């Protein structure tokens, strides 16, 4: 019997790839997904996640973390008056003196993984997939995609004693 897996599903290419890999490895019947709304301007993300889950026939749970990010000045969030930049990460980092890009939502992945761990444990899942990758960590654009952030995996293991995280950039 295959272990159960939870996939953090945003509807983007990275999380959709994680979903397909989880289904391939664990079987469709052993995969569930969590989609998180956090007040992002692009509500099409949630619509895409629903469409992807429907396509694969996967059970989806949704969670609204909008209040948690109400104080962030991140340009991705709907309450921000700032435009989402079109420049490359390298250009943005140069303009900001090496500070994270304006689309960085503080500790978003940390909160997402913590929420996913809680839901996953309740659903008896022992693996969590999410689509962070090295490009997002380049130059400290998104600190919660960095190698240092991998420590979050160890915290999840300690807290749950049975849940491990599988990251797209680390899949073998």
Regions found by a protein language model. Name each.
Residues 2-172:
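ATP-dependent adenylation/nucleotidyltransferase module used to activate substrates
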């Amino acid at each position: 019997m295959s272990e159960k897996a939870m996939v953090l599903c945003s509807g983007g290419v990275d999380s959709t790839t994680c979903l397909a890999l989880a289904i391939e490895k664990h079987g469709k019947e052993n995969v569930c997904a969590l989609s998180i709304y956090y007040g992002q301007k692009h509500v099409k993300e949630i619509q895409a996640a629903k469409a992807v889950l429907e396509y694969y026939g996967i059970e989806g749970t949704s969670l609204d973390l909008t209040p948690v990010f109400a104080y962030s000045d991140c340009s991705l969030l709907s309450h921000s008056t700032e435009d989402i930049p079109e420049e490359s990460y390298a250009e943005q980092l140069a303009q900001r003196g090496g500070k994270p890009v304006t689309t960085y939502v503080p500790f978003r992945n940390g909160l997402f993984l913590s929420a996913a761990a809680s839901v996953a444990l309740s659903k008896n899942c022992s693996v969590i997939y999410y689509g962070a990758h090295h490009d997002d960590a380049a130059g400290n654009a998104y600190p919660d995609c960095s190698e240092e952030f991998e420590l979050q995996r160890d915290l999840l293991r300690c807290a749950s004693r049975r849940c491990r995280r599988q990251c797209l950039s680390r899949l073998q």
